[in-house]
Each structure stands twice: as structure tokens, then as C-alpha cells.
A protein has these predicted regions:
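Small-residue (G/A/S/T)-rich helix-start motifs and N-terminal tracts that mark the onset
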Residues: 1-100
């Protein structure tokens, strides 16, 4: 079991005791719908990793990082008080473009 503890700083725990503190994201991600967005990103990444025999823990770390980056972009564009889960999802294309 890999544990993802969602908060202003998301913690990702591995059964062997490793814990990663995600450096991206902000308190605006605590609003309704952003947990669902994160779950969808995680599901998509894990499905691809399983097909390509990629380490699932590293995949979860990457997915959480990217979700946080989208949240950071949404905060800059809309402000964390008013940003929504839809805003975060829309910012994913900018994240992927930035990472290419």
C-alpha cells in the first residue's frame, strides 16, 4: 500500500518507511473536487506505469508533483481563494508543456 496524505504539503508513504514530501501545491488545492482531480491523475499515471513496468511509488510521486504544479499555476492565474478543481484540471496542459 502506498499512502497519499493530502494537505497543503502532500505526503507520500511507502511500506518500506520512505516518505516523500511533495514540494508543489498550495492550500487552494484543499477545496472541493481537487481530491477527485488528484485521484484521477493518480489512476491515469498508475494505469500507464503498470502497462510499462514502471515503479508505482515513483509514479505516485510524479503524479502528485504534477497535480501540485497544476495547482500552483491555477493559483497564479486565478488566486487560491477562488481557484476551482476545474481551473486546476485546465492547467494540466500547461504543466505537461512546461515539462517537455
Amino acid at each position: 500500500v502506498i499512502l497519499v496524505l493530502k494537505g497543503e504539503r502532500v505526503l507520500i508513504g511507502h511500506p518500506d518507511g520512505r516518505v516523500v514530501v511533495n514540494p508543489t501545491g498550495n492550500s487552494g488545492l484543499g477545496k472541493a473536487g481537487n481530491g477527485d482531480t488528484l485521484a484521477g491523475i493518480l489512476a491515469g499515471f498508475i494505469a500507464q506505469a503498470a502497462r510499462m513496468d514502471i515503479d508505482i511509488f515513483e509514479t505516485v510521486v510524479a503524479a502528485v508533483y504534477i497535480a501540485g504544479m497544476a495547482g500552483d499555476i491555477a493559483e497564479k492565474k486565478f488566486g487560491k481563494r477562488v481557484m476551482t478543481a476545474s481551473d486546476v484540471r485546465e492547467c494540466l496542459t500547461e504543466v505537461f508543456a512546461e515539462l517537455e
